[in-house]
């Protein structure tokens, strides 16, 4: 739209009138400015230039853009050349999701170039090994309908449409986070969904960043949705200097950061969540285990509320739109353990932070989120005030993947894991009950067995569940 070609999306049609949601500042737009259609829904370009880079909520690069992103820029710079190595030859048959080439950048892990969904046929020609731009045609397919199609290393995909898979598979093993309280007490399965609600100052952002740094996924997609600029600045400053504890390589080689701070347009904040999950699905389709960290889904819900209010829609509970629940379902249900179109097992796990006002877990966003997640990691203000981090309350949190993961641990040398977990939780629950009594009569007045229970529970809390995110010896264990 306009001379700057601002990016927008049609969200309502009323006869000859269209309501357009603009993803950028509209200062300078005036009646009579030209509008041109793209012919497609809001889409992003998925290709080899994603890993190790930083983008805004519309997947526009933030590196080399100065203090603010230039208006009208709607996709990454395509002038970068990438080392291209073909995996097929003329006459080979390719179907959707199959790899036809590999790109090995010096600053990122190897990535495969995939045939886009909905495309299949025989290879008519393919470029030799060399360096090409991600939008240069490198392969031509003769399609079954008699036509031909040029394929490049990258391809566009609409962010609100889930990418197809061959089959959704049952979960098998855990996503190891490096946090003892999560991995031992409330584990998340690969391809699972987790929520992390907590009030102000309970450590949501630090815990999200810690999971992004140390979890054992192949690729991390971190999206700061509506977060404060100084917090995102800390992420952008710290991540490039960190090393992956498993490989020793720079952590950014397996990371995509999407920064959409609170001073960016509200419409772009609403789109950033879908952009992030689409990027995650793209790497999942390459056979990788992907973890998506969304901080915070409450800011995303607030963006939905603001856009809904401007459209004059009837508000639901808390002023949020009536379709808030279905939008959350659309997002969380894209997490799965799948068999890709290429025939590989892969997963996309989603961990969403929730910021309920006044730490009220009965508010609409938290309430609806609990319906779609299998892990609920409740952050407690009392534990945070006591400087007990991670401030996850062991009696308010839960995981629904315990039964499946018990089988995993039985096969990997610890058949008593579920029993030990129940004993841990039982001790902590009894500690909470006995501490109320001890505050009245004093610890010394309790029977020896109850004093022993309090001592054991204190040892569990202090030596096992407590973990410092800033200690080199303790931040990942």
How would you label these PLM feature ranges?
Residues 1-64, 68-70:
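N-terminal accessory targeting/assembly segments
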Residues 2, 40-41, 59, 99, ...:
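Short, surface-exposed secondary-structure boundary micro-motifs
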Residues 7-9, 22, 37-41, 112, ...:
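Short beta-alpha junctions and helix-cap segments that line functional grooves
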Residues 64-105, 109-116, 123, 133-193, ...:
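P-loop NTPase nucleotide-binding/switch module
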Residues 184-185, 191-477:
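P-loop NTPase catalytic core
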